[in-house]
Amino acid sequence: MGNYFNTLNLRQQLDQLGRCRFMDREEFADEVNFLKGKKIVIIGCGAQGLNQGLNMRDSGLDIAYALRPEAIEEKRASFQRASENGFVVGTYQQLIPTADLVINLTPDKQHSKVVADVMPLIKQGAALGYSHGLNIVELGEKIRQDITVVMVAPKCPGTEVREEFKRGFGVPTLIAVHPENDPKGEGLAIAKAWAAATGGHRAGVLESSFVAEVKSDLMGEQTILCGMLQAGSLVCYDKLIADGKDPAYAGKLIQYGWETITEALKQGGITLMMDRLSNSAKLRAFSLSEQIKEKLDFLFKKHMDDIISGEFSRVMMEDWANGDANLLEWREQTGKTAFENAPKGENIKISEQEYFDHGVLMVAMVKAGVELAFDTMVETGIYEESAYYESLHELPLIANTIARKRLYEMNVVISDTAEYGNYLFANVAAPILAKEIIPTLKRGDLGESTPATEIDNILLRDVNDAIRQHPIELIGQELRGYMTDMKRISSQE
């Protein structure tokens, strides 16, 4: 196997990167009918596996779970989750030969082994589904020619996929058909029915490609979604302690600050997030964000370049082969940081507005990271819609995991692939922020309110225009229109 993307010529690469079409709701008029009466077997019962399966069953589809014999015999967590929810559970040999659609929802690093084990068992003309295309794009997995290969990728953690479905809604979803494996021309119909069964069609579906999904997903999770939050958490906490702030207060401000700040981002984009600040603080946050963008622009571009070339996947897979030595070392180092071990601050009260007023630097980091990730993806040929979902849209969901159990929880919830990329970014970004940005801070940038200053009306007007006219704000306003029923995401409700 080799990197599939690197086997394509330049025209094909650009075509695949640029695949992005927002689908009309009318295209889902048949909803799940194409898969009604067909046998669907899900491999793996983690967060995505279980919650997608629950939604699909509630949508009237026939769902069963195929697990490894040892998982069944030892009654591991995956077996317990599936059986306790009333699903048929069996081995690969028992369930896959009769399946019309086999959905591989195991972790990325298990995909090659899983596909090798199940492909001989998949019946002629059946379909194989993924929710992330790393195995196809980066590892170059070749699937038997009679098998249709599709992807349905909800742009949320599995728990949110279920919660939104229970509310009668759904989460934005990306679908794709592998161009090398659509022998009967049924791939799009399968993907549409699967997306509808999870509820995704109610929140907006992008028809994309395996390539565009993988390259944009890796970029988002490595930079703004995880890497920037990790680097920002560590640097901001250390600065607060250096300034003599109470460790419990500092820990709480950072732990819950990202969630509170990005809730505004979720509802009204960068514009609303910045509008939560006083005029003096907004001008300062804008200035800081421009400084951060200048210092980190090269790093965002390096990550994008390494993702496009396949260098990131090559290095990560070397670590897989080495027993995850780097991943485990970085995970251990994160667990020993001052922020992770700060007091919980359970008796400290911080109002919603105080998170903004005392977190101007954090707001600036969010703005800079979102815009850099979006701009870098678009410059690379990824469409604005995909870039939006892989940067701004998912950020509140990741921030919510930090609010639950700090960086530990974030790194548990995200995939090992995302966690590895997060460390690669944060390990470089944090020292840069500490050296280049922290020494330039002024009173009111972090840990206390920005002092009121005389406001230059023309400057404020120009800053407001710059915020509102950024391309991510324009596409974001359009896409959020499809998500009018979005609920608040908060660990503190």
Curated annotation (Swiss-Prot):
Residues 209-345, 346-486 form the KARI C-terminal knotted domain. Mg(2+) 2 binds at D217, E390, E394. PANTHER family: KETOL-ACID REDUCTOISOMERASE, MITOCHONDRIAL. Residues 14-208 form the KARI N-terminal Rossmann domain. One of its GO terms (cellular component) is cytosol. GO terms for molecular function: ketol-acid reductoisomerase activity; magnesium ion binding. InterPro entries: 6-PGluconate_DH-like_C_sf, 6PGD_dom2, KARI, KARI_C, KARI_N, NAD(P)-bd_dom_sf. This is Ketol-acid reductoisomerase (NADP(+)).
